[in-house]
Amino acid sequence: MDLPIDHFRLLGVSPSAEPETILRRLETRCDSPPDQGFTHEALLQRADLLRRSADLLTDPSDRAEYEAALLRLSESHPNGTVGLDLPTSSEVAGLILLWEAHGALEAFQLARQGLQPPQAPALGSGREADLTLLAALACSDAALEEQDQRRYESAAQLLIDGIQLQQRMGKLPDQQRLLEDALQALTPFRILDLLSRDLGDQDSHQRGLTLLDEL
């Protein structure tokens, strides 16, 4: 998996951070893993990825080489996204870290992709459980980010996608209910969003009127 995040962001430090700051941050991150119910294996892999990033960023030669690679990439692809190539065994942990680094939308999209054939995990596996949980959490956060930008219909569509995924997986009824409640609470804002659009956007207006009728 090509994870759309660099070592600095994964660890949660500034690109100018000194080694002492990086090591303190590593300790803090390892001591406070997410407590939403991920498997022990996923959290161990998360800690391992954090340590690897810290090792690279505290080694002067490795860090200099990495920073030079980042600079070359920014010069050749100004709008490109830096990525980390992760083995399959670390994918779930990488997505958890991406979600923690405020990459909720990307984490949701990649988790949903990971639950689709042909890469879907074995039924009942820890990987399936972790990806299903992450998809719910990341979907919720991504929808909140859209709400903060007043993109209410976009937030609703994210929640609908998340609910449909949870319905298909059938593993986390409580998380599904939270997404459904969030979608319901969005209804008045969706109506205003859809009805305030340009008059030429008839589809949006009709959708807004339909939601209004359903209130």
Roles of regions detected by a PLM:
Residues 1-38, 49, 53, 64-68, ...:
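N-terminal J-domain/J-like co-chaperone modules of DnaJ/Hsp40 proteins
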Residues 33, 73, 118-122, 159, ...:
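Alpha-helical junction/boundary sensor with strong preference for TPR arrays
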Residues 39, 117-130, 167-178:
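Flexible helix-coil transition and linker loops at the boundaries of alpha-helical arrays
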Residues 104, 152, 159, 201-205:
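TPR-repeat structural position
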